[in-house]
Amino acid sequence: MDKEAAKRRIEELHEILNQYNYEYHTLDRPSVPDAEYDARMRELISLEEEHPDLKAADSPSQRVGGAVLDAFQKVRHGTPMLSLGNAFNEQDLLDFDRRVRQAVGDDIAYNVELKIDGLAVSLRYENGVFVRGATRGDGTTGEDITENLKTIRSIPLKIKRPLSIEVRGEAFMPKPSFEALNEKRLQNEEEPFANPRNAAAGSLRQLDTKIAAKRNLDIFVYSIAELDEIGVESQSEGLDLLDELGFKTNKERRTCQTIEEVIELIETLKTKRADFSYEIDGIVIKVDSLAQQEELGFTAKSPRWAVAYKFPAEEVVTKLLDIELSVGRTGVITPTAILEPVKVAGTTVQRASLHNEDLIKEKDIRLLDQVIVKKAGDIIPEVAGVLIDQRTGEEKPFHMPTECPECHSELVRIEGEVALRCINPECPAQIREGLIHFVSRNAMNIDGLGERVITQLFKEQLVSRVSDLYRLTKEELIQLERMGEKSVENLLRSIEQSKENSLERLLFGLGIRFIGSKAAKTLALHFGDIDQLKQATKEQLLEVDEIGEKMADAVVTYFEKEEILNLLNELKELGVNMTYTGPKPVKVEESDSYFAGKTIVLTGKLEEMARNDAKAAIEALGGKLAGSVSKKTDLVIAGEAAGSKLTKAEELNIEIWDEVKMLEELKK
């Protein structure tokens, strides 16, 4: 076929395949069998391979993936992608309605939409062609994920009119795709995704676009961010226009004239939640009129004209099949409920937390009981109660053992503690869990050394002490399951890099009782190096800000042990850094930062900056981080899904910032 004929045929195939895509993925009404679609796609790819210069940016062939990216570029949003304020009950909705009416009067209509549990994205079109897609990021700056978004077949690569427009939507993984993906991951002995939202986010942040293309993602577009020339006067009109242009919008939407009508609709939608083929975590209520939206405006972190009603934690009933015991790195014995598989909050749950023996006794939890399992968002499922009236007589009381399930040493209960402990320092489970803790993100942060690899290394007797990690060789690692040459090289590089970590990471990784990451940082900063710390007396430790008696006793006891001193000498000889190399906090009187001398609480999920990095940056400018909100708190920085701490800050009239404002202050 000559070039001119190829060009004409490619244009025809574009039109045909775009129509097939629209019918199948947007209208859910395919007009041809899959085999016909596949044949036309193969024809297009073949022609584009023959004539590479005829391959257009909006070609349907872009949906199969193939490009491998080096990194995601930053994208600044022309119109910020702000998060929404939350409503958790009927009173919150009535308060929202009252605020709206006080501002713009009683002539109000609300547009009610499902809150899809996925990843918020922005899609930019120039002259009708999809040119850029980005994540929300911190609301001001996101990441360019255009190539991965092109693999979502419900995103039109070319819309039905040559408009320049930016739209917002929620990319998600449908429930059937999520279940199939996790089943495949389990077959490959890979860690399953916790929920469809994590799976969608992970898929769209793959540098290899072929992986994203295989994940069967979908999208609902829910708003127009920027559009010239065409007059749209309401949210509902905007959604109708999006439909006309070929975007996929959610049809479970309605315009309500009163807040009471909204509340009634929410109750109806709650009952349908399990029937949707995608996860929802709430309902979004928006003032329908765009003129009224403009009049209401924004707070620092969210629009005043919209609110997200969040569903309460989901509860289901299932059978308790067994109670499994595990041994943590400090010897604590933790019971876990083994359940008859049940769907809760979007995932299949087979295990749930029982916390400790006292909870089992308090709730009179018995084997084979019908139990209530509760899960909200990403939290670990927990057994919230028992249906005693459904007992049949086959249920059996559960008794905690007197011996460690791993090493069979006698278990003890330390005075004042709820938990049973194994106090055998040679207990294999404690050693293994200690190694897992040592390499974890907040400790030595050795990338590639997760629980699976550590368990293998321990089982093969290649490591039994943390110092053994620094003696591992390529020859030893290459013999492990699913460890290729490249993986081994990356792992050895990561182990070597961890030697340069600042002292606080090592201290936290060693697992000294009562010393969390914050206390480890405080001690490292105060003493400067391990030699000064291990010689410190209890009195000297108590002089350190925020170090209490239990912590001081634990540190002194830890460094009195000969085996610990030998371990530290080994690590030093192996090249592990033993000094504090992190930023030194600015003295309050020397800092002109807003944070200097203030007590600050971080709450919710930060999108742009890791929480630990944000803490370190604030502390370096003289700020003091606190874990809870009180009258002494000067500032609360609220990220996504901030909860009770934000509510308390509002009650106490404490200043509240979002992540965007925090980043602006840090950049000064």
Curated annotation (Swiss-Prot):
Cofactor(s) the protein requires to work: Mg(2+); Mn(2+)
Reaction(s) catalysed by this chain's protein: NAD(+) + (deoxyribonucleotide)n-3'-hydroxyl + 5'-phospho-(deoxyribonucleotide)m = (deoxyribonucleotide)n+m + AMP + beta-nicotinamide D-nucleotide
SUPFAM superfamilies: BRCT domain, DNA ligase/mRNA capping enzyme, catalytic domain, Nucleic acid-binding proteins, RuvA domain 2-like
Binding site for NAD(+): 34-38, 83-84, 113, 136, 170, 286, 310
InterPro entries given in the database record: BRCT_dom (IPR001357), BRCT_dom_sf (IPR036420), DisA/LigA_HHH (IPR041663), DNA_ligase (IPR001679), DNA_ligase_AS (IPR018239), DNA_ligase_CS (IPR033136), DNAligase_adenylation (IPR013839), DNAligase_N (IPR013840)
One GO BP annotation of this record: DNA replication
Disulfide cysteine pairs (residue numbers): none
Active site: 115
Pfam families xref list: BRCT, DNA_ligase_aden, DNA_ligase_OB, DNA_ligase_ZBD, HHH_2, HHH_5
Residues involved in Zn(2+) binding: 404, 407, 422, 427
Keyword RNA-binding in annotation: no
PANTHER family linked to this entry: CHROMOSOME TRANSMISSION FIDELITY FACTOR 18, DNA LIGASE
Annotated function: DNA ligase that catalyzes the formation of phosphodiester linkages between 5'-phosphoryl and 3'-hydroxyl groups in double-stranded DNA using NAD as a coenzyme and as the energy source for the reaction. It is essential for DNA replication and repair of damaged DNA.
Name used for this protein in its record: DNA ligase
Gene label: ligA
